Design a protein with these regions (language model features):
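Flexible, solvent-exposed loop/hinge segments and secondary-structure transition points
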Residues: 19-129, 135-139, 143-156
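Bacterial N-terminal signal peptides that target proteins for export
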Residues: 1-8
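Bacterial N-terminal signal peptides
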Residues: 8-16
Length: 156
C-alpha cells in the first residue's frame, strides 16, 4: 500500500497543477494600424499609447484604439479601427495570453463587429455570438468594445 502511495502521490500532484498560460503576440500596434488603415500617411496621437487619429494627407480617415480586457485569468490586448463616423471597420486581437480559448481570434467572430456603432446593442447572445470554450473572453472583449464605442463617440 505504501508503495502505491509513493508512486501515485507525485503523479497526482503533477497532474493537478493547471497548465501554464502562454502569451502569443499576433500583431504589434504599428502592424495593426497599417492593417486597419493601409492608406494612412500618419497616425497622430490623441491619447498616449491608446488612441490615434489615422490621416491620409490632411484628411482624417478614422481612429485606431488599443485596449486590454481580462479573459478568464489573463489579459487580452485588442484594437478597434473606426471610420470617421464612429462605425467599426476592423477589430484585431493583438495578444492572447490564455492557454485555451484562442478561437477569440476567429475572423468570422471578429467580423460580427464590423459596421457596428455605439447605437448597436453589442451583446453576446443578441447580435454577437458566444464562443464555446472562450465564454468569458468573448463576453469581456464584447464588453470592452462597447465601452470603447461609448468613449469613441467623443472623438467625432
Amino acid at each position: 500500500m505504501t508503495r502505491w502511495i509513493a508512486w501515485t502521490a507525485p503523479a497526482a500532484l503533477v497532474l493537478s497543477v493547471g497548465s501554464a498560460a502562454h502569451a502569443v503576440q499576433y500583431l504589434t500596434i504599428p502592424e495593426a494600424q497599417r492593417r486597419a488603415f493601409p492608406s494612412a500617411t500618419n497616425f497622430m496621437v490623441v491619447q498616449t499609447d491608446r488612441i490615434w487619429r489615422a490621416e491620409a494627407g490632411n484628411r482624417v480617415i478614422g481612429f485606431f484604439i488599443f485596449d486590454r480586457v481580462i479573459g478568464k485569468h489573463l489579459y487580452i490586448d485588442y484594437s478597434i479601427a473606426l471610420d470617421p463616423s464612429g462605425r467599426i471597420r476592423q477589430v484585431d486581437i493583438l495578444q492572447y495570453r490564455e492557454s485555451y480559448g484562442g478561437e477569440i481570434r476567429s475572423p468570422s467572430w471578429l467580423a460580427q463587429f464590423i459596421g457596428k456603432s455605439n447605437a448597436s446593442p453589442l451583446q453576446v447572445g443578441n447580435d454577437i455570438r458566444n464562443i464555446s470554450g472562450a465564454t468569458l473572453s468573448s463576453h469581456h472583449v464584447t464588453e470592452g468594445i462597447k465601452r470603447i464605442m461609448t468613449i469613441a463617440d467623443r472623438l467625432k
